[in-house]
UniProtKB/Swiss-Prot annotation:
InterPro entries according to UniProt: 5-3_exonuclease_C_sf, Flap_endonuc, Flap_endonuc_arc, HhH2, PIN-like_dom_sf, XPG-I_dom, XPG/Rad2, XPG_CS
Designated gene of the protein: fen
EC numbers: 3.1.-.-
This protein's name: Flap endonuclease 1
Subunit structure: Interacts with PCNA. PCNA stimulates the nuclease activity without altering cleavage specificity.
NCBIfam families named among the record's database cross-references: fen_arch
Length: 338
């Protein structure tokens, strides 16, 4: 998903403790998709309530977000609006990949291949309107604000860092850097020992922070030139140029200065080039208000335990931590006022 700039970027290992006191914008669709993929039962299936409704996203939002709050990190979830029209081909390709994985899953089920069943199941996820609406309901009950983007969520989330209202964007996607995010936090909600898809092996995944200005300075380029590099390698809005990865694209842009010179000299065709550059430089965004409210503890129990069969003892244990954190934060605000 998105642009792959990993090979040319400086990344620093970080932790929740390192980011204590921060307000962060969360690329909601990106993170919810991660929850749906990773929070699953032993059979590889997503968590479900007694009515068969998927609840992996609710588990992720409640427990992982509570962990952020416990570390004095305040999240503002940002939800996607209408996709940019040039994203249609990417969405179509993702749909085809899911269809192929569904066919492979059916074959794995027929042959009782448990390893393949678990691996393929984790790749077949859909963020439905119900999943989005229930995510927003839970955030409201937790007293957490969310922002509705007019288009791409990572663009809105990145804009919020440019305004100085949040410290970083929580997302797996490097696209945020093209949209101007000052900092992105990767592996911030799902970390630790993680299983490698399709195998029994695990790797240790650590949170990392990527600073835009540090990387631009290190690479000796501007943000617009970083966008050029992204376009050459491929984004959600264009397929990229065959044979050009991030390192080659960087070399070309540093040699020829801009993408127009590159495509002319190399005889490359890129459709909708000006429109893509403009969208990354000046994406649409909505006005917003960031206001944190007192959690509705009874409402959370009714919603998670009453409606979705969460363990009441585990939910209450987490709510006690949220309550302590809220009271501590509220008292700190009063102390600053007086």
């Amino acid at each position: 998903m998105g642009v792959n700039l990993s090979s040319i970027l400086i990344k620093h290992e970080t932790s929740l403790k390192d980011n204590s006191g921060s307000i962060v914008s969360v690329d909601a669709y990106n993170i919810i998709y991660q929850f749906l993929s990773s929070i699953r039962g032993d059979d590889g299936e997503p968590l479900k309530d007694s009515n068969g409704n998927i609840t992996s996203h609710l588990s992720g939002i409640f427990y992982r977000t509570s962990n952020l709050l416990e570390n004095n990190i305040k999240p503002v979830y940002v939800f996607d609006g209408k996709p940019f029209h040039l994203k249609s081909e990417t969405l179509r390709e993702r749909s085809l990949i899911k269809e192929k994985n569904i066919m492979k899953l059916e074959e794995a089920i027929a042959s009782n291949d448990d390893a393949k069943i678990r691996s393929l199941s984790s790749r077949i996820n859909y963020i439905t309107d119900d999943i989005v609406n229930e995510s927003k309901t839970l955030l409201n009950l937790m007293g957490l604000p969310y922002v509705q983007a007019p288009s791409e969520g990572e663009a809105q989330a990145s804009y919020m860092t440019l305004k100085g209202d949040v410290n970083a964007v929580v997302s797996q996607d490097y696209d945020c850097l093209l949209f101007g995010a000052k900092r992105i936090l990767r592996n911030f909600t799902v970390y630790g020992r993680r299983r490698i898809a399709g195998t029994s092996r695990t790797i240790n995944v650590n949170p990392e922070i990527i600073d835009l200005n540090e990387n631009l300075s290190n690479l000796g380029i501007s943000r617009e030139q970083l966008i050029y590099i992204g376009i050459l390698t491929g984004t959600d809005f264009n397929p990229g140029v065959k044979g050009i990865g991030a390192k080659t694209a960087l070399s070309l842009i540093k040699k020829y200065n801009d993408i127009y010179s590159v495509i002319k000299i190399k005889n490359i065709g890129i459709d909708n080039l000006d429109e893509i550059i403009e969208f990354f430089m000046n994406p649409p965004h909505n006005d917003y208000e960031i206001k944190f409210n007192e959690p509705d503890f009874d409402g959370i129990i009714d919603f998670l335990c009453g409606k979705h069969n969460f363990s009441e003892s585990r939910v209450n244990e987490t709510l006690e931590k949220i309550s302590r954190n809220y009271k501590k934060d509220h008292q700190s605000s009063l102390d600053r006022f007086f």
